[in-house]
């Protein structure tokens, strides 16, 4: 990692002999108005503004007329399949015991023998953060309010859901009534 060589937003590094490709990765906001689905605290704020507002107004109907909460097509793809969170590196270190910084090129390039393992760890953690950050947070809120959680992911029919929902089975683990969208 060249991070120690960055001072005042400038890279001060003596390039060793050889052929080099320097890659710079940042976690940037892209203007998407959705909550950070990978961050349970952000999702809790979303739930406070939405679900809790309904509960505050219709608490007597929860568990009777209102038996479930429903979400429709949350997705990581709105960020062109690159949804990330600024807490990712920290959570990666906790889970795997090292920084993910040197693995990021594997998202776009073959980095050698470790390419597949790096992708599995990076995308695997992102899938876990998504399922636990969004689905689990919604499910816990619903359970605490006497209703079920249900809904469905965006594009659950595609063969490779990594950029959309991460891991569909993991998402379903945190839904009381997992759903799919069958149109047509």
Q: Which ranges hold each PLM region?
A:
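Mature extracytoplasmic enzyme cores
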Residues: 1-120, 127-129
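Weak global preference for isoleucine
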Residues: 6, 15, 66-70, 111, ...
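Generic recognition of flexible, low-complexity loop/linker segments
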Residues: 11-12, 55-58, 136-140, 165-169
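Secondary-structure transition/capping motifs at alpha-helix termini
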Residues: 59-61, 139-148, 170-175
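Aromatic-lined carbohydrate-recognition surfaces of secreted/lumenal glycan-active proteins
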Residues: 67-73, 126-164
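Substrate-binding cleft/loops of secretory-pathway carbohydrate-active enzymes
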Residues: 74-87, 150-184
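Short, basic, glycine/proline-bearing loop/turn elements
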Residues: 121-125, 180-181
């Amino acid at each position: 990692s060249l991070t120690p060589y960055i001072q005042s937003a400038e890279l001060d590094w003596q390039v060793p002999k050889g052929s080099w490709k320097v890659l710079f990765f940042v976690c940037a906001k892209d203007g998407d108005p959705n909550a950070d689905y990978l961050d349970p605290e952000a999702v809790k704020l979303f739930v406070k503004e939405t679900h809790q507002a309904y509960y505050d107004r219709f608490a007597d109907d929860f568990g009777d007329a209102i038996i479930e909460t429903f979400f429709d097509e949350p997705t990581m793809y709105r960020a062109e399949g690159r949804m990330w969170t600024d807490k990712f590196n920290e959570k990666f270190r906790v889970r795997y015991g090292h920084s993910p910084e040197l693995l990021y090129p594997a998202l776009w390039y073959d980095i050698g023998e470790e390419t597949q393992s790096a992708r599995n760890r990076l995308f695997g953690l992102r899938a876990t953060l998504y399922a636990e950050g969004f689905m689990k947070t919604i499910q816990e809120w619903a359970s605490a309010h006497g209703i079920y959680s249900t809904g469905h992911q965006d594009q659950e029919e595609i063969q490779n859901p990594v950029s959309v929902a991460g891991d569909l089975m993991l998402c379903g683990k945190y839904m009381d009534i997992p759903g799919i969208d069958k149109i047509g």
